[in-house]
Amino acid sequence: MPTVEVFNKEGKKVEDIELSEKVFGAKISESALHQVVVAQLANKRQGTQSAKTRTEVSGGGIKPWRQKGTGRARQGSIRAPQWIHGGVVFAPKPRDYRISIPKSMRRTAMLSALTSKVNDKEMIVLDELKIDAPKTKEIVKMLNAFEAKKALIVVAESDQNVYKSVRNIQGAAVIPANNLNVYDILKYDKFIVTKEAVSKIEEVYA
């Protein structure tokens, strides 16, 4: 079983805990990680881009001058793409970029991401993270104690005081354990998770 140290907010070691082998000691699948991250990024896209083709722009399709005898290049329509106010060639249209990923692959990717953080010594377990009132200074102090410039903080339950304390810090984010996803785990250098949140993660994936 993987063993990690538990720290307090000041960065001092409190104890050691054993993690679930199934969750934090799984075999890493780089292909699953890649496919799930690509799918997550694709699913974030709005897909609302749109432009008009030559058949959709306003104005008539009148032929600007006769075909022969003017000395100028032949033109068929004043709404052809090469004209000002003309239509767009192969104009983008609204589309759905969503990629469906099998549940088993999502699970494999999640376990791979969690295991990689343990293997790379990038997972930091906190005994608790309680703040009486929103205070960015407290979170900054904690991040400095762990030398964490880019960190994902995972809490057991959504906490407005913690959320408001973190939201103004560039390079840091907070997320409840039930919203944990592969992209966010890999995006940040440090994976800071409370002891209670670890239990929740193991409860879901063990």
From Swiss-Prot:
Cellular component, GO annotation: ribonucleoprotein complex; ribosome
Keyword Repeat part of the UniProt annotation: no
GO molecular function: rRNA binding; structural constituent of ribosome
GO BP, sorted A to Z: translation
Sorted UniProt keywords: Ribonucleoprotein, Ribosomal protein, RNA-binding, rRNA-binding
Disulfide bridges in this chain: none
Domain of life: Bacteria
Annotated function: One of the primary rRNA binding proteins, this protein initially binds near the 5'-end of the 23S rRNA. It is important during the early stages of 50S assembly. It makes multiple contacts with different domains of the 23S rRNA in the assembled 50S subunit and ribosome.
Family the UniProt entry places it in: Belongs to the universal ribosomal protein uL4 family.
Name the UniProt record assigns to this protein: Large ribosomal subunit protein uL4
Organism: Clostridium acetobutylicum (strain ATCC 824 / DSM 792 / JCM 1419 / IAM 19013 / LMG 5710 / NBRC 13948 / NRRL B-527 / VKM B-1787 / 2291 / W)
